[in-house]
Amino acid sequence: MKHLPKHLRPRWRYLAVGIETWPNASFGRRAFQREVWYAAQNLLGDTGSAETDMTVLQFHDYDGTAEAIVRTRRGQTNPARAALTCLDSVDDDDVRVRVRGISGTVRACEEKYIRGPPEFTEQRHVVFENADRSATVRPPRYDVETASDGAFVGATALDFR
């Protein structure tokens, strides 16, 4: 089978995506890809979702954060960004998704927007709501575990002074 000439090949754009979640959440590329497809289909419909053709090329999961590169067709970056902002959970874990930037090549996307592993995280015991609680520290954030249900409360260093 012959290759298509360069001017007939589909052109792509690559979205660098930063994902933030609670420290105990864990999900992989497959779960994130599934949620991206559902978000695109719910927002854009079947034909709009097919036109954007969003695919997760790379996914790196760290403790409470993740980074991904999502491929979409050229000219469909705005609908793709809108679909990504509709994501609020992956595998029943709450997430915050932020598009860091858009590039024309995967390499440029990695070099400009993918930062690699975040700073170190550590476990501390802090006093929160007049009780000794366990907290995961990711400067400048503190994720304090609540005693009742094991959920987390987001805080900053200013909340402990």
Swiss-Prot record:
GO terms for cellular component: cytoplasm; multimeric ribonuclease P complex. Its EC number is 3.1.26.5. Transmembrane segments: none annotated. GO terms for biological process: tRNA 5'-leader removal. Disulfide bonds: none annotated. It is an enzyme of class 3 (hydrolase). Keywords: Cytoplasm, Endonuclease, Hydrolase, Nuclease, tRNA processing. It comes from the Archaea. Pfam families: RNase_P_Rpp14. Belongs to the eukaryotic/archaeal RNase P protein component 2 family. Part of ribonuclease P, a protein complex that generates mature tRNA molecules by cleaving their 5'-ends. This is Ribonuclease P protein component 2. It comes from Haloarcula marismortui (strain ATCC 43049 / DSM 3752 / JCM 8966 / VKM B-1809). The lineage of its organism: Archaea, Methanobacteriati, Methanobacteriota, Stenosarchaea group, Halobacteria. The gene is rnp2.
